[in-house]
């Protein structure tokens, strides 16, 4: 077995005069919506609504816009000062035509396997990240996506994250969501390769490729606090960590995407390479 080394990178943020915005997200029937992705517009500040729809988010300007996004509902932008109660309108989906899938599941291949054995974990706050899987004609014989494997590390027994599948749009960016509802995944304690069975969704590998990614859930059930003494001030500092950590490895591909304020931004200025989440797919026939 090859040795896999894990490096930890903790990025600490300095805090200025932030004020906390508290609110709740509900649907048109006044029912709470959990796991809504919430961002401060044009800033790397985000959070997730709790099971009861409540949320807290820090901003130094109440005139800033907050962006709300979740599968199955229309996206919405609201002033921070007016976000005590945010109502999202559900999207009415037409009934899908019943399709019979003639799956055999007698053959499997794994794609996206990483060769670099040095994995890194970054705890840098709210995060949506993706990995691109290009199409190959040989996948035609194993076109169904059966499983997702994602390398994780957690200090909590039942941490959760959200998985996403995106089509490729006309500009090569992550486009429409391929699932019609959230896929919340439970991650067990420890460092491991977590397998997620997605065969019930009948996902077929698109001819333009597919983006597969995760969304970190900044909720209380995923939070672990630890205290330490600041050597400069001799004061006790409390650090909040949100699990699970998704592991990354370094790749030569310099083109990547960053999710900011509800949209994907292309990054291709790092010619040396970049870090990519360790995700692979199991395809079957």
Model-derived regions, located:
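Bacterial Sec-dependent N-terminal signal peptides
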Residues: 1-24, 285
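Short, ordered, surface-exposed loop/turn motifs in non-cytosolic proteins
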Residues: 21, 27-42
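A short, amphipathic beta-strand motif
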Residues: 21-27, 53, 86
């Amino acid at each position: 077995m090859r040795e896999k080394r894990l490096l930890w990178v903790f990025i600490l943020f300095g805090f200025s005069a932030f004020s906390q915005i508290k609110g709740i997200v509900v649907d048109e029937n006044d029912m709470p919506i959990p796991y809504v992705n919430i961002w401060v517009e044009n800033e790397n500040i985000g959070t997730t609504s709790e099971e009861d729809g409540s949320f807290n988010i820090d901003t130094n300007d109440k005139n800033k816009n907050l962006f709300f996004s979740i599968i199955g509902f229309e996206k919405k932008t609201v002033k921070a000062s007016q976000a005590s109660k945010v109502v999202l309108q559900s999207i009415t989906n037409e009934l899908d035509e019943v399709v019979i899938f003639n799956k055999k599941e007698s053959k499997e291949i794994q794609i996206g396997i990483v060769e670099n054995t040095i994995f890194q974990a970054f705890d840098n706050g709210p995060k949506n990240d993706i990995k691109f899987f290009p199409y190959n004609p040989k996948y035609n014989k194993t076109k169904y996506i059966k499983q997702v494997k994602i390398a994780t590390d957690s200090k909590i027994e039942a941490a959760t994250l959200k998985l996403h599948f995106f089509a490729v749009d006309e500009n090569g960016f992550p486009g429409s969501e391929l699932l019609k509802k959230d896929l919340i995944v439970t991650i067990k304690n420890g460092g491991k390769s977590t397998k997620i069975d997605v065969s019930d969704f009948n996902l077929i590998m698109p001819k333009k490729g597919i983006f597969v990614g995760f969304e970190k859930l900044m909720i209380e059930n995923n939070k672990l606090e630890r205290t330490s003494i600041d050597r400069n001030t001799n004061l006790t500092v409390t650090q909040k960590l949100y699990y699970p950590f998704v592991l990354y490895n370094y790749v030569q591909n310099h083109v990547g995407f960053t999710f900011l304020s509800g949209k994907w931004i292309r990054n291709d200025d790092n010619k040396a390479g970049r870090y990519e989440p360790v995700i692979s797919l199991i395809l079957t026939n």
